[in-house]
Amino acid sequence: VPHFSVPTLDGTFYFQQEWTGHDIYYFLFKYTDSNGNSNSATWGQNPGTFIRGLPENVHLFFGSFDSTYHTDVVNRKAAVENSLNPNEETAWEGRIHYIDQRANSITGGLGQMISNFNSPMYMGIDRFQMARETGSLYAWTSSNNDPKHLIHEPHQWNAEFPVEIRRHDSGVQEITALD
């Protein structure tokens, strides 16, 4: 993912300055289509429960495609602050960002991700600096979408990292079983 910068409620976030190779960058966007259909059930989930389930190396971004983007992220910030206790707020300080720009006008690497993904409401950047789409939110057991499925994506990206690093170790011989 190439460099990008976005205005946030706390100042401009510069990806190139923040990139360490140890963190995951996770983006959740609110979206309402022309018929009024939206992902408000997912967007409106309890952010405290969601955040508590994420790995500690996540930078979490909230943004919106809607014309009400500023109000959307201000309200999301209030919901986050109301759902975390003081210790959790301290632990996540500087790691939760509220994008103060309409998502469809974002440029740079993040803008490219938004333009190229089929459903850019939930996506991330892994530790290899690769753009990642999220999987399905559908829960077969309840026959509904379950926003908590989003918690698993960054855990999986973290789990893939040491495996991929190990594949490049000169002491490892990779053998293709099926081609």
Regions found by a protein language model. Name each.
Residues 1-32, 38-65, 69-119, 124-179:
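Non-globular targeting/processing and membrane-anchoring segments
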